[in-house]
């Protein structure tokens, strides 16, 4: 009789525990979690700057050479890269090593790229200062390219300020942009990647981070501000 009582008690306990687990699992998560002012006001403790503050920091300085990365810095170019992957290497990054992709990307596919608003503001500010504008990209070089004209047209850059795009390419273990920033004596360089910031520093330039859009095809997203650099507010678009 004692054994039957113990067995019944154990079965009852097991049923109770299982019921609790099932109840917890089937309980829906709150649809509206809510927030508060403290959470809304919370910002990552990094060096945020605005375009106006950058302009103010350059007051009194003579015209200089300034540089911009292209993809995710001045252009949201994911549509072209997305199409390239689907066309040349579905499911892999091998298309980035395919010269056929770069021929397409550098000769027309930027017609599908969207100019970023932060780039419009920055370039307009530097043109007003009389600065020389350079674009230094990690894209592979091709025999012909229409990127320079696309950028000049998109951002209304006068011929006197515009320079041909520099295709630095990508080499493992080497920051290919550094030598170009040095050669062109670029004093300020804007980019979305860690390599852009380190290239600027290696070249003795001021590296300023532009935020990469969350829906960029280039993942993972970099940790902006992790290198102690200036990061432009609202620069993801």
Swiss-Prot record:
Binding site for Mg(2+): 69, 71, 192
Parts forming coiled coils: none
Superkingdom in the source lineage: Bacteria
Top EC category: hydrolase
Locations listed in the record: Periplasm
Any Gene Ontology CC annotation: outer membrane-bounded periplasmic space
Signal sequence, renumbered to the chain: 1-25
Any single Pfam family the record assigns to this protein: Acid_phosphat_B
Cofactor (UniProt): Mg(2+)
One Gene Ontology MF term: metal ion binding
UniProt family annotation: Belongs to the class B bacterial acid phosphatase family.
Subunit structure: Homotetramer.
Protein name: Class B acid phosphatase
Species whose genome carries this gene: Klebsiella pneumoniae (strain 342)
Encoding gene per record: aphA
């Amino acid at each position: 009789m004692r054994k039957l009582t113990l067995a019944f008690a154990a079965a009852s306990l097991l049923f109770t525990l299982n019921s609790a687990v099932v109840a917890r699992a089937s309980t829906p998560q709150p649809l509206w979690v809510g927030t508060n002012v403290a959470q809304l006001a919370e910002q990552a403790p990094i060096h945020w700057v605005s375009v106006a503050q950058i302009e103010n920091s350059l007051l009194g300085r003579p015209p200089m050479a300034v540089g911009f990365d292209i993809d995710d810095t001045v252009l949201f170019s994911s549509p072209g890269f997305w199409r390239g992957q689907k066309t040349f290497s579905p499911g892999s990054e091998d298309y980035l090593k395919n010269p056929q992709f770069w021929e397409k990307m550098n000769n027309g596919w930027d017609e599908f790229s969207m100019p970023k608003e932060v780039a419009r503001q920055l370039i307009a500010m530097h043109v007003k200062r009389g600065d020389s504008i350079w674009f230094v990209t990690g894209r592979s070089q091709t025999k012909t390219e229409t990127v320079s004209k696309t950028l000049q047209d998109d951002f209304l850059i006068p011929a006197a300020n515009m320079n041909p795009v520099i295709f630095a390419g990508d080499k493992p273990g080497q920051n290919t942009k550094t030598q170009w920033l040095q050669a062109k004596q670029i004093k300020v360089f804007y980019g979305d990647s860690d390599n852009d910031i380190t290239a600027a520093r290696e070249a003795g330039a001021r590296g300023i981070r532009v935020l990469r859009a969350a829906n960029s095809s280039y993942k993972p997203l970099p940790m902006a501000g992790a290198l102690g650099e200036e990061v432009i507010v609202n620069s993801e678009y």
